Amino acid sequence: MQKMRFFRRCLPLFLAFWLLLAVAGAPFAAYAGESVTVRDGSGQVRYAAPMDPENACPALQSALDTVRSGAYGTCTVTVTPGEYRMTKSAVLASDMTLDLTGVTLLNANAGKGNILISPNRDRTGKDYTGYSALENCTLRGGTLDYAPGNTNGSCLLRLAHCKNVTVDGTAFLNNTDSHHAELAAGYNVRFVNCLFSGQTNQTESSAEALQIDILEKNRHFANFPAYDGTMNQKITVEDCTFQDLICGVGTRNAFAGRYQKGVTIRGNTFRRLQGTAIVCTNYVDAVIEKNTITDCGRGVAYYMCKNSGVTDVFTDGSGKVLGKRNTDCGSRITDNTISVCQTAEMDKPRGMFLYGGKATGKMPAGNYAVYNLTVSGNTITTTGGGITGTDLQNCTLADNRITHTGAAKETTVGILLHGSSGNLIEKNICTALHNGLKCMDASHSNELRSNTVTDSRSSAVCIVDSNGVEVTENTIRTGATNGIFMQRSKKARLLRNTIQAMGHNGICLAEKSTAATGSNRISGCRRYGISSQPGTALTTVGDRLTGNTKGQGIAQGSKNMKFSTIGSTRLVGGRIRRGKYKGKIALQWKAVPGAKQYVLYRRDGSTRGKYRRVVTRTGTRYIDTAPKRGKTAAYRLVAQTKTNGVTAQSPVARAAVRIKG
């Protein structure tokens, strides 16, 4: 009986409690599984509301505004898994994580518009400077896509004036006539583990799925003032997948004299892109590494200058540079695996296209060279070219492996330099290209060292209209024409190369070229070891030429004379004892078969000073007026023979005579 009375007394309280729960839970029950929740750092719910699947923006924006109020510190906004239409852009807030795991948001704007944006004047009434619009924000998971029939040419995500932003594991799908995501004026912004897939009605000229853009108000980033020249810094794109697109990630447009700094594009996968996977324009301190690029039109493009075409370049309105012309890129493109082929957007595929130059047209006048860029450890398979560089200065291209898989008729080059000087091309492997290595158009003073070129379909190494090029310690085998071919080029040094089984000559000089060769090993060529055509000048020292079908070498002048290298001589030195010196030193040397003359040089002092020519003799003895007592006379001697512009010279013989006081 007492229990019954207790139950009757408490019944109204129980009923009130359950009624309260029913009322509070009614909205959630009406939209079961379709809600947005804001929790603070302690996990306490600060906002919860239903989201209409046909118009999710009002509820989502209210949640984001709750965070933006700043009343609850750093928050997490969670959306219940499901598919939602966004008829208006939602403005992101600082100090939050937006968790979209299992969520699909569809861009259903009636006109131009995005799904998510950083704060801007249109939505908040404020102008933002620097990186002040959005800070400490993470977007996690989810899929951003377009509603059926939405072809308005808008991005899915647009960020500007932002700092410490991460987009992690989000899929961006099915863009038409725009970019999937766009970023300008960002600092420490990261896209990681994201998917970019599906793109139509765009062209190679303007179609990066993820565009790292400039903050320019008229053509590239409208509606995000202030336009204060803030550039991107420390942008990271890592472990993302780009597939079935026009282009992948990067930048085409530039402010003259301002630079995107510290961009890292690492460990991404690019496949089936019609255009370029990675586009870098005005990048400094950039790292492009460990990406896998498959079945794309072009792998990596790196621009420091573009006079015309697809790049927009902006100045201060009077044609002046906004900042200053950078002289040091300080960037590297390393350890990428690249496979390129002809596509609808790229009829001349290349693994890499590196471009600087002297500005004309819309760029303020000056030289915008690609200076101090390292390209190393890349593997390139191509139906077109490998690496093409224009106006590269003091760059290193090393340890790259380039293989051509296209038709034999294609005129392709493994590493091609235009107007580029002072670069090191080292330890690259080029296989089955028209030319393996080529310097042309005033590409002066480059060093081509320790490369391997095999199965070239023309000359393996070409030097055209370029002076002072050094080709040293390379291995060249089984090419269709020449191992090393020079045309209208001066003062080349071709040293210690191994050249085997070329279809024509091991080394060929043409059209007034001049070169010094030394210690090359040339064998098995179907014509000559070395061919020096009319009007050229060649000095050859210690080359070893064997088994070449038509002979060791030929000087193609009026007599078309064959020449052979000549062997070493031996110069006898010694010591003149105290009191025996009479002001003269008698020198003698061993005669060399085939030598027509001997040239003697002397340096006064054992370690310093220049060697100066003393005499040219046909005999094997000479009496020299030597230095004063207490000095050392250091001598060098070479044997020579000359034939139609070819000077065959023996290795240097050395001797030192110590004159006692």
Please report, for each region that a protein language model flagged, where it lies by residue.
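Acidic Gly/Asp/Thr-rich repetitive segments characteristic of extracellular carbohydrate-active
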Residues: 42-80
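Short, T/G/N/S-enriched strand-turn elements that build extracellular solenoid repeat scaffolds
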Residues: 60-69, 85-94, 108, 127-129, ...
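N-terminal extracellular ligand-recognition/capping segment immediately after the signal peptide
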Residues: 72-114, 120-122, 144, 172
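Short glycine/acidic-rich loop motifs that flank beta-strands on beta-rich extracellular proteins
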Residues: 85-89, 107-113, 147-155, 176-183, ...
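Right-handed parallel beta-helix
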Residues: 127-272, 277
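Pro/Thr/Ser/Gly-rich low-complexity, intrinsically disordered linker/stalk tracts
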Residues: 564-594, 629, 646-661
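Beta-strand-rich modules
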Residues: 624-645
